[in-house]
Structure formats: structure tokens, C-alpha cells
Amino acid sequence: MAVRPRIQLLDTVTINQIAAGEVIENAVSVVKELVENALDAGADEIEVETLGGGQGLIVVKDNGCGMSSDEVTLALKRHATSKIEEFSDVFSLSSFGFRGEALPAIASISKMEILSCPKGEEGSRTIIHGGEVIAAEAKPRQLGTTISVDSLFYNVPVRRGFQKSPQTNRIAMRKLLENRILSLESVGWSWISERQQEFHILKHQGLAERVAFVMGEGFMQEALRVDRVEEPIRIVGFLGSPCFHRPTRLGQRIFINDRPVDSPLISKQISEAYTMLLPPQRYPVFVLKLYLPPQWCDFNVHPQKTEVRILKEEFVREFLSESIGEVLARSQESSSYKKTSLTLPTLRFFDGQLPEISLEQPRESMSLPVTQLATPSIRSISSLGCQQEIPAVDTQTEIVWGESQEVRFLTSLGKIVLAEDSEGVHAIFTEAARKHLFYLSLIENQQEHYKSQSFLVPLCLEVTPQERVFLLSHIEEFKQLGIEISQIGPCVFAIESAPTFIGEEELKSWILSLAAESHTKVDKKAIALLIKESLTQTIFGKTLRTFDISWLSLLWQIGKPEKAFDGTLIRRLILDEDFIKE
């Protein structure tokens, strides 16, 4: 007979470790909580040091009010806090933390040391392992607190096994600290990662300087200043020029009452203001700080406090729409900005000038003698730009492919080409076919360098710190495609050469999009394929109106595939007349 389970109280360490599962996801969460504690202690100088992306060591030093030895002991107990006294205080918060859970939760899953000194006292040192205080002594220190966290998750091996790579943690940690740099202009920040200084921001540096540091000088050169008050609301910050946009929302920094938040409401409202100014599926870049009455905001939605409920949402929406709309309207009136469309160069896939069939020509039927063409191969597709003359095609000779297979070009119907072999009549979807052949050429040539041209003046590319890590990690993959990239500044790269089949502006836009969407991925092989797929999609993102009839031979050579690498339809065997009518 099974033993009846009995209800019992959990011990304090277990309770704190359970709480850590909600509050502390990784090393980045630890830095976030310790930094917020430092800010709530009134610090205006904060230094963060990390090793192994925080998995090895995290140290946060501040010059805040400090704690006495007794207060340190109390702070290690759950729900001990100096920030609220009763529940109603939650709805008028001026502090970043209030639950009193973070410090005991972190202490329960790590080896921690707290060195702290309040005004007029000597200071103390407390050592905690797995939530248990193992040593406490007097220790001199200047006003403030230093908290060191070592061996994170050492006593929770399951959690430790699910931690992300140090590189991923560093990327997330940088964004966390950048948000703090932007949100609090009166605080100086320093970050030392892997024993190297990442940045040092002085507390007297204003918002414009901080935005330039985080978002890049390129953003600030044409950024639009926002500063509007309609009591009791204020919005301040910088909007990106309409010519400065990204493929994702990663370039959007939103703060409410100096808290970095994820706010679909604000993001959507601002994106709508840019609707007529940006290309499709592109997003504006901005840094905006919204100040609302504390009683209008509920940050007690999630322990991470990155979500917020806004009480008078409709009023806030109208205020945002008017504020952003006015700034954008003024910028359009005072500038000569005009949207431009990129023009792709004509693409030729073979070592020669092959005949092309315009898909807008009248329908006609003809036989195509593949044997008289310079028989192409997948490997030859990447040889672009050679202009050699090819003998004219004899359109009356019947095609013989190999010894037993024959294929004939029949006619063109809009974006579809009809061809016939012994199996029947096939509809070839030209855009998908062309895209797939180009992609196969990239895969086939993965060990070779593509023919490229050097730029007389290298193209300058300004990226975010996250995108910088991605580019530095995959320089060799770009080089295999004939794209040579080098770093010339902290977040500035030079594109020195590139294949002739992609235009300069298209190239820059593609690299930025790829870096923005893929900076969290670390698998080298997956990234190499992703780069090739992404480049193919970029080049063939526009409607193409020509189709080399010699490409039919290539399609049959590779087994006349039905679908392209991305799942789009290339070929369909026509079984009845209804399909043609469709």
C-alpha cells in the first residue's frame, strides 16, 4: 500500500531556490537584479564585472547608501525590502524592485559575498553558500556595496545544464546595460567583461551622447528629437529618420518611467506613424522615454517587470500618435527626403550572353535544341559577368537530352514557361526556378571564392553591438561568397569587395537584415546555409521578367525538382486543361 503523502512546510533554502526559478533565469537576470538594487540604494556610479558571460563570476559595485551587518542578514530573508510597506505602495512605485525576492533567491543558487558599508560605519563582509551564511566579519569599505556572485547554479545542476553560451549571455547583458545607460542619465556606468573594459559612461554625459554610443553615430546624424509635454504625460527621446530602418523591432528602445519595457502598444502606435514613410515589412528605429503618473502603471505583471499595464491607454495612444506625427511631419517639410527603390543589376547565370525569352512577348511555340547550347552546369552559374558571344540557336532542330530523354520549350504564359518531355507537359514557374538554381550554385561553390570586385572606396556599415558579434563570428562565411568585411571601429565595418551580382545598397541592406535577425544563432554550419538562403532571397525578392531558355537543361540535369529550397513550387506536370486556365 502506498504511503500517504503528508503536507509539510518547506525549508527556507528550498523556498528560495523555487523563487529563483521565477526570478533568476540566467546570469543576465542576476546582473539585472543586482543593478536594480544598486539603483534603489541611490547609487550614481555602478561598475559591473563578468567572467564567462556571468557563469564564472559577477561583481556589481556601487556607491549607494550601503547596508549595516544586521541589514545584510535581514536582506537575505525572503520578502525583506526597504521599498514598500504595504500593498498599495506597489501602485505608486518609484523604485525598480519591491518584492524582496531577488537577493535571497540568488544567494540560494550560488556562492555569494556581500561587502557593504553605510554612512558613518566601518563596513562588513558576509559570505553565503547556497543560501547559508558561512562567515560574517567587519571589513572596511567606502560608502556603498559590492556583491560578488560565483559558481551560479552550482547546487542546481539541472538548471546549469540548460544555460546558454557565454557569448549569448554577453549579448543579452550588453543590451541590459545599454538600456540602463539610456534610461538613467544621472548614473555613470562601467562594464568589464572577460577582464576587458567594454565601456565607461560618465554620469554627466547627456541623453544625446548616450544614444549616439548605444545606437551609433549614423543613427544620430539624422535622428529627430522628440520632447513634448501634455500634463501629466511627457515623452522625450529620438526617432530614427525614415531612411534609417530595420527588418525587425530590435532597434526600438522603449522606457516607461525609466524602466525598459516591451510594449506592443507603443511599438505599434509609432510604427503606424511611419506607415507611409517606410518600405514594406521594415520597422522604425527609436529611443523613446515615456513618463506617466505612477498610479497609471502596473509593473507587477511579471517578476522581470518588463511588461506593464497602462491605466488610461486610449489617452496615451492619442498622445503618442500626435507627438510622433508632428515630429515626422516637420521633418518631411524641412527635408528633401524621398523614398527610393533599389534597382537590381541584370543577372546572367552563365559564361556568355545566352538568349533570353521575354515573358511579355506574344505566345508562340518553338523547339529548343539543348545540344547546340553551351551546356551549363550548376557550378558555372556563379560565373557572372563574362560577355562572350554564343552561336545562334537553331530553333528547328529537335532536342535530344543524353541518349533517351528529350525536352522542348513550348511557350511562355506570363510568369510560367511550358516545356515538354516524354512524361508530358510541364509548367515551370520561372521565378522559383531561377532562385533555386542560384541557391544551388552557392551551395556547389561553398569551398571556392566567388568572383568579386573591390570597391575604390569601401562601403561603411554601422551596426549594433549584437550585430557586431555576429559579423565578427562569420567573416569567413561571407568571404566564401566573395564578400570581404573588416572591422574598422567599435561598431563600424568596411565592406571591401563583393560579387558583381548584387548592388551596393542592396548589399548593405542585406547584411544589416541578416545580422539583425540572426545575431543570437551560434551554429556555424546552420549560419553558413542561412547566409546563402538569405542572399538568394534578397537577390530574387523582386519580380523578374526574363528567363534563359537554357535553364531548362539545368532543371532536367538536376532531376527536374518540383520545389525550391524554400518550398516554393518550381515545376508541375499538367494533367488537365483546367490548370492552364488557372
Swiss-Prot record:
InterPro entries: DNA_mismatch_repair_CS, DNA_mismatch_repair_MutL, DNA_mismatch_S5_2-like, HATPase_C_sf, MutL/Mlh/PMS, MutL/Mlh/Pms-like, MutL_C, MutL_C_regsub
Domain of life: Bacteria
DNA damage listed as a keyword: yes
Keywords of the record: DNA damage, DNA repair
One Gene Ontology term from the biological process aspect of the record: mismatch repair
One Pfam match: MutL_C
Stretches of the chain forming a coiled coil according to its record: none
Signal peptide positions on this chain: none
Gene Ontology MF: a single term: mismatched DNA binding
GO cellular component terms given for this protein: mismatch repair complex
Function: This protein is involved in the repair of mismatches in DNA. It is required for dam-dependent methyl-directed DNA mismatch repair. May act as a 'molecular matchmaker', a protein that promotes the formation of a stable complex between two or more DNA-binding proteins in an ATP-dependent manner without itself being part of a final effector complex.
HAMAP family: DNA_mis_repair (MF_00149)
Family named by the database record: Belongs to the DNA mismatch repair MutL/HexB family.
Name under which the protein is recorded: DNA mismatch repair protein MutL
Gene source species: Chlamydia abortus (strain DSM 27085 / S26/3)
Gene designation per UniProt: mutL
